[in-house]
Amino acid sequence: MSFARQALTLFSLLAVANGVSAFAESSLTSVGVSLPARLYRNWFAQMASSGGPEVSYRSVGSASAQWALIRQTVDFAVSDAPMQPKDLAKVRRGVVQIPIAGSAIAFGYNQPGCDLKLTQLQDVQLASGRITDWKQLGCESGSLTWVYRSDVSGITDAFTQSMQAFSSQWPLGTGASIRWPADHAIAAEGNSGVAAAIEKRRGAIGYLGLSHLSGSVRAAALQNKAGEFQRPNLISAAKALKAIELDFNLAGSSPNPSLEGAYPIVTLIWVLAYRSGNGENTPAIRAALDFMLSSQAQSQVAELGLIPLEAEMLSKSRPVVERIAQ
């Protein structure tokens, strides 16, 4: 059975379960981070063509996505950082946050002839501006330029949490926005902006979601807590996601997983929706989230450079959709 046929069958069943005849006239608005944008747009196009609700998706930073939910200007949002308790308290309608997929965060670089393997201390020294020449990393001498996110980003939050976990020498703290050293560094907006900046500039290196690596931008192998050097891929990132323990709000992280074979920098991606006050859009919102968590949709995640959820985490995510109410 084709994916489109499976999706059509799924939405037919969801329509019956929700007591409605179809979702064809349902239109939902969403915003979210750039990391999974291609995946979500692909999902939403298939949903609409298979009898599901139509969903618009605009790429913004994680802070902007969460702010849109707080301001109640969207039906749901997508973030690569969970909402903090102080922000959850600002949403009177309540929030459900549901892990949908995961991602590795790579050290992407453009330095031909260099097969880069970084210890955890080197990761920290690089990102804090203490390495400025490629010869310090065992490569041919040349100026090194650090590329960082200019926008407020969950990727930056997850990345800096890992840097802090890697070494007590990390001096910049953690968060979605960091004051990076200005020397030998340039800023770029979004994962795509970081990828473009690295690709255009020989000698550049920065952090970005694995799904945005392309062209001349390669991923460094990073030392994990077990002492192994792992490149970011489906297998090594999936092992790292297993180390994440979710709390009662389904938030969680593992900034330096100890599992053998695990890539050391990963994050989850969450859908943030309202617990109540969804009105006539309730069935469509539930159907959209049920679709994202379906085996059919999850089977497409890896094709776009992200990490599908394994059975244990799916078993925690799927029941939460039922908390979304009118």
List the predicted regions and their residue ranges:
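Hydrophobic alpha-helical membrane-embedded or membrane-associated segments
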Residues: 10-14, 33
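C-terminal segment of classical bacterial N-terminal signal peptides
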Residues: 14-22
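Bacterial N-terminal signal peptides that target proteins for export
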Residues: 1-9
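Flexible loop/hinge segments at secondary-structure junctions
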Residues: 23-326
